[in-house]
Amino acid sequence: RIVHVVYGRGREHEVIEVSTFRAYLDNAAAEQVAGNEKTSRSELAGMQHAVDSTGRVLRDNVWGPQEEDAVRRDFTINAMYYDPQTQVVVDYHKGIQDAKKRTLRMIGDPATRYREDPVRIIRAVRFAAKLSPLGFTLDAKTAAPLVQSQALLADVPQSRMFDEMLKLLQTGHALATIEQLKKLGMATGIYPLLDVVVERADTPFVNAALADTDRRVGEGKPVAPSFLLATVLWADVRDGWARRQERQPPFPALQDAIDDVFDKRIGDVSGRGKLAADMREIWVMQ
């Protein structure tokens, strides 16, 4: 269970996430389903521990002790616990040692952990980009299976992949993330729309939007995915608009060009309606 506790009042309040510890389960003993979270929803309803045909964990929310909860974490530096009463840091996986060495190391066998949850591949890139200014680098064994494991992301629901892409681009380290993807040999293959962002990141127009997004996050200002994605995909809209104007009036041609871009580049993801409305407004104003 996860509970969000509001601490304080007014603008100065904090939201503290409180959760129970969860058990580390042997995935070899899990029940297997043929589909994913959506296609096997009714089948998963009665299961505590289930994986799909690739070994990706779909259900494993079981209470457990702190030491097992630590094993479930992805990186050693993300598996430390602070006891506010004794003021002691509980470190089961040498996270402090790795932090001093500025090393991002996966707990357990990296290839297995990526198979259990392929989104860890994206988290590895995001952490490496975020902490690179502090000198952190991925451990060689953690980085080695990344490219080969990319294919596992094809089984992750598109809405989750879209959300994870936004985390890469809207947490203040978009440019560093793109450099990290190139460095790791992962400039393509994670998510089609992200491929477009990486491909166009060196163009002055898109690069300025990425830099501005990083700047706003650094200044504590809000950022909107509609602005960044509208910038990245404007070339598609502009070119489609020009083609359609050969046989349509300008405004209907623009609307149809926008629809084409949404269908081709973004697809059916949660929240598309609001996102589409905002992006459409930006493009129409051009």
Predicted regions and their residues:
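Catalytic cores of the polymerase beta-like nucleotidyltransferase superfamily
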Residues: 1-286
